[in-house]
UniProtKB/Swiss-Prot annotation:
It comes from Escherichia coli (strain K12). GO terms for cellular component: ATP-binding cassette (ABC) transporter complex, substrate-binding subunit-containing; membrane; plasma membrane. One of its GO terms (molecular function) is phosphate transmembrane transporter activity. The lineage of its organism: Bacteria, Pseudomonadati, Pseudomonadota, Gammaproteobacteria, Enterobacterales. The gene is pstC. This is Phosphate transport system permease protein PstC. Residues 1-24, 95-117, 188-232, 304-319 are cytoplasmic. Residues 45-74, 138-167, 253-283 are periplasmic. InterPro entries: MetI-like, MetI-like_sf, Phosphate_PstC, Phosphate_Transport_Permease.
Length: 319
């Protein structure tokens, strides 16, 4: 019997080779872009690195007319506002995610979830304008003044809430950042909580566990990696936020007090305010070094989150 021809020709290896080359090229482009950013930041900031050295990191003074620059105030403002934002946003986001996945009635889950996603879509400049013209005056009258009167006489803690109630400042910027990152963290937490197998939760309820026990002993252990990822996503958003912080932080290079009520500055705000007006080469180099510092901070945060997730996975496997 004569051999019949196949209905179609089998695919050759040429397509696989082309696909493999394209995928590798895409990965290489990502690495080249990352390396290019790092190299360009180092080259552009080199005059500042040569002149100020490591002292740039802990010098408070920023005097553009005299070409004296220090990054301590922007670094302090960036880290403190981000910490305040996380301190507020994480528990609120945790509560929102748990309510949506465990407690909310069916008719409320979808509209509330859409509302959270819409909050994440609001441009940061809108948050900044709202924070400056609406939030800051109310914050000064209804929070800063009464809390300052109560807390200012308490040793150590009182120093954080002392001084005049401007409305704007480091604390106000941290609160605005918290409002901005809550939708991101809450959305990620909600999605990872929904990945918990229903059978595990129903089995826990079946043996008499309360809702809190199910959340604490079933949902959280199963989703802890995703929860950490959501928190780090929010932290990265807070570290890199520019416009909203620029509106509300005060934009001053002063660090004479530990009070959170005082105006300050952040790395992103300094770059946004001064880059277009920088004239001298050293001024531009100092601003580029601020960008390099922000890049390093972001890299450290990412590396720490990856290390934490790896440790959690290792400990889970050892049980």
């Amino acid at each position: 019997m004569a051999a019949t021809k196949p209905a179609f020709n089998p695919p050759g290896k040429k397509g696989d080779i082309i696909f493999s080359v394209l995928v590798k090229l895409a990965a290489l482009i990502v690495l080249l872009m990352l390396g290019g950013i790092i190299v360009s930041l180092i080259i552009s900031s080199w005059p500042s690195i040569q002149k100020f050295g490591l002292a740039f990191l802990w010098t408070k003074e920023w005097d553009a007319p005299n070409d004296i620059y220090g990054a301590l105030v922007p670094i302090y403002g960036t880290l403190v506002t981000s910490f305040i934002a996380l301190l507020i946003a994480v528990p609120v986001s945790f509560g929102i995610a748990l309510f949506l996945t465990e407690l909310a009635p069916g008719w409320l889950k979808r509209p509330l979830g859409i509302a959270i996603e819409l909050l994440a879509a609001i441009p940061s400049i809108v948050y900044g304008m709202w924070g400056l013209f609406i939030f800051a005056p109310l914050f000064a009258v209804y929070f800063q003044e009464p809390v300052g009167n109560i807390m200012s006489n308490i040793p150590i803690v009182g120093a954080l809430f002392s001084g005049p109630a401007f409305g704007i400042g480091i604390l106000a910027a941290g609160v605005i950042l918290a409002i901005m990152i809550i939708p991101y963290i809450a959305a990620v937490m909600r999605d990872v909580f929904e990945q918990t197998p229903v059978m595990m939760k129903e089995s826990a309820y079946g043996i008499g566990c309360t809702t809190w026990e199910v959340i604490w002993r079933i949902v959280l252990p199963f989703t802890k990696n995703g929860v950490i990822g959501g928190i780090m996503l929010g932290l990265g958003r807070a570290l890199g936020e520019t416009m909203a912080v620029t509106f509300i932080i005060g934009n001053t290079y002063q660090l004479d007090s530990a009070s959170l009520y005082m105006p300050g500055n952040s790395i992103t705000s300094a770059l946004a305010n001064e880059f277009a007006e920088a004239e001298s080469g050293l001024h531009v180099a100092a601003l580029m070094e601020l960008g390099l510092i922000l890049f390093v901070i972001t890299f450290i945060v990412l590396a720490a989150s990856k290390f934490m997730i790896m440790r959690l996975a290792k400990n889970e496997g050892a049980r």
